[in-house]
Amino acid sequence: MPDEAISILSQKSSDSGLHIQLHPLALLTISDHITRHAARSQQGPIVGGLLGQHNGREITVEHGFECVVEIGPNGEAQLPNEWFVDRVKQFKDVHKVPALDLIGWWSTAPPSGPTTAHLPIHRQILQNHNESAVFLTFHPSQVQGASQSQGKLPLTIYESVYEGESVTENGKAMQVDGEEQLLNIRFRELPYTIETGEAEMIGIDTVARTARNAAATETSTVAAPSSQIDSDKQEQQPANTDLLSPEEEELIASLNTRLNAIRTLESRISLIKSYLSSISPSSEEGQKDSATKPDHTILRDINSLLSNLSLLTPHEQSAFSAETLAQNNDVSLVALLGQLSQSVNGMREVGKRTAIVNSVRRNRKQLGAQSRYEDDILGRDGVALG
């Protein structure tokens, strides 16, 4: 959307009492759409739809989706009506429990607020889909300073109202006698909070853990000579062998975490052993360092820790080992039976093929013997006629 258009932000604050609950999945969709649009150097407005629930004075923004934008006859941005209706219906079929509906749309806008360039699409959604649709604006110019603003997101959510052309700062319209008051769409900012479900927390945690392995690469559009490409490959081949894939880096990080945990556990066990040795009168360390006094609180904690070990280790180790061995034997037996079945099938195939070969050979021998017999008969008949 062009930033040089006229701002249509209302001078009056919202008095509707609406409150927006914004979910992270919608934010991820918006961020992904804007990032791909910028990475591909695409032109044109960035527009998307918002799905959620409208319960009284609370509106939830739970999901978002991208929208196709077409240019109207007067150069304004519009949504293809048939495509948009089908798209919303598809998302409603997917999100049936809980039932989600179209509650608004989103786009990019300057920090000063929506402009007249946003009105065509907003009017289209108000007239055809939702009379109380909200408008979420993302401010790309505030992305760099978002980390320095104590976590404030670079976005604003608005509701649309109809106001007269001449509205004072306190919200009262100035109407001239005998003149009809014209009503235009104005936007008022709404408060919002971030709400996160359990499934969203898992998804965001996965994205956060795998984001460190993401990297951007630039593709060159200029074709280099084949000789130069071969030489570059030969020079770069040893360097590429040292690079690790994202999966390998994640595996190394996981192994390092487990190694650090094991080292910490070992140090704690060594500390407990040294403490018990220092207070035990029967040990050499206890006789040398008799100044160490037993602490009953620490001893009770150690005793509780040792008692919990029995829950991890079975009481009857022999029975557990026998059961484990029996399970291993069952698995091995099933594997051997499978191999035996494959061997039997292979032997059957060999027997069938051998029978076919023997049958062909037998037929050939019979044909050869029959032909020799016929030749002998023909030879005898010729001698008799002569």
UniProtKB/Swiss-Prot annotation:
Location relative to the cell: Cytoplasm; Nucleus
GO biological process: cleistothecium development; protein deneddylation
Positions in coiled-coil regions: none
Pfam families tied to this protein: JAB (PF01398), MitMem_reg (PF13012)
Limits of the MPN domain: 20-164
GO molecular-function term, one example from the UniProt record: metallopeptidase activity
CDD domains, per the entry: MPN_CSN6 (cd08063)
Keywords: Cytoplasm, Nucleus, Signalosome
Main location group: cytoplasm
GO cellular component: COP9 signalosome; cytoplasm
Keyword Nucleus included in the entry's annotation: yes
Family from the record: Belongs to the peptidase M67A family. CSN6 subfamily.
Assembly behavior: Component of the COP9 signalosome (CSN) complex.
Role summary: Component of the COP9 signalosome (CSN) complex that acts as an regulator of the ubiquitin (Ubl) conjugation pathway by mediating the deneddylation of the cullin subunit of SCF-type E3 ubiquitin-protein ligase complexes. The CSN complex seems to link protein degradation to sexual development.
Protein name: COP9 signalosome complex subunit 6
The organism of origin for this protein: Emericella nidulans (strain FGSC A4 / ATCC 38163 / CBS 112.46 / NRRL 194 / M139)
Gene name per UniProt: csnF
